[in-house]
Curated annotation (Swiss-Prot):
Belongs to the mitochondrion-specific ribosomal protein mS26 family. The lineage of its organism: Eukaryota, Metazoa, Chordata, Craniata, Vertebrata. Disulfide bonds: none annotated. The gene is MRPS26. This is Small ribosomal subunit protein mS26. One of its GO terms (biological process) is mitochondrial translation. It comes from Bos taurus (Bovine).
Length: 205
């Protein structure tokens, strides 16, 4: 056998392998004639003790059951180790991914907070400017109203002073009575419900 294998190993390169016939022992086929010493021989199985057969069968069953349990335990342990190793790698990879995602989210959050802070400060400055402008406009409006009110009161005072010149006092009472008697203006008239002035009609007119 070793010699045949050595010849196979010593085959030069580039040549196809040659066919070798190796001797092998085996069972006869059903078409081969029996040996001369076996002609007329009847094969009888050995006697089997029932008790021993039962014991052997039970022991083989227990053996196969034990081997099956051990094999299942070994397979479970190997699978558990593989799962733990894979889970450890996956857990580490997931932890790295989570850490990277956390850093990205923190950076985005900081940038968003900065943007919102700038918008808030701009809005507060705009509101302050609008408040100052409104206060200035309100002060100007109040100043204009005060000035207009002062002018109105001044005109009222002047008008009152002008009207006071025509007031009837104790000193000019006689003169005003004489003036009213001498005046040709007639106050003998009436006003209708429609607002029309009705003057009396003299007979000679």
């Amino acid at each position: 056998m070793l010699r045949a294998l050595s010849t196979l190993g010593a085959r030069p390169l580039g040549r196809p392998p040659a066919q070798f016939l190796l001797l092998a022992r085996g069972r006869k086929t059903r078409h081969d004639p029996p040996a001369k010493s076996k002609i007329g021989r009847v094969a009888t199985p050995p006697a089997v003790d029932p008790a021993e057969f039962f014991v052997l069968t039970e022991r083989y069953r227990q053996y196969r059951q034990t081997v099956r349990a051990l094999r299942q335990e070994f397979v479970t342990e190997v699978r558990r180790k593989v799962h733990e190793a894979r889970a450890g790698v996956l857990a580490e990879r997931k932890a790295l991914q989570d850490a990277a995602e956390h850093r990205e989210l923190m950076a985005w959050n900081q940038a968003e907070n900065q943007r919102l802070h700038e918008l808030r400060m701009a809005r507060l400055r705009q509101e302050a400017r609008e408040q100052e402008q409104w206060q200035a406009e309100e002060a100007a409006r109040e100043a204009r109203e005060a000035e207009a009110w002062a002018r109105l009161k001044e005109q009222e005072v002047l008008q009152l002073q002008e009207d006071a010149k025509n007031f009837i006092t104790r000193e000019n009472l006689e003169a005003r009575v004489e003036e009213a008697l001498d005046s040709p203006k007639s106050y003998n008239w009436a006003v209708t419900r429609e607002g029309q002035v009705v003057t009396p009609q003299h007979k000679g007119s």
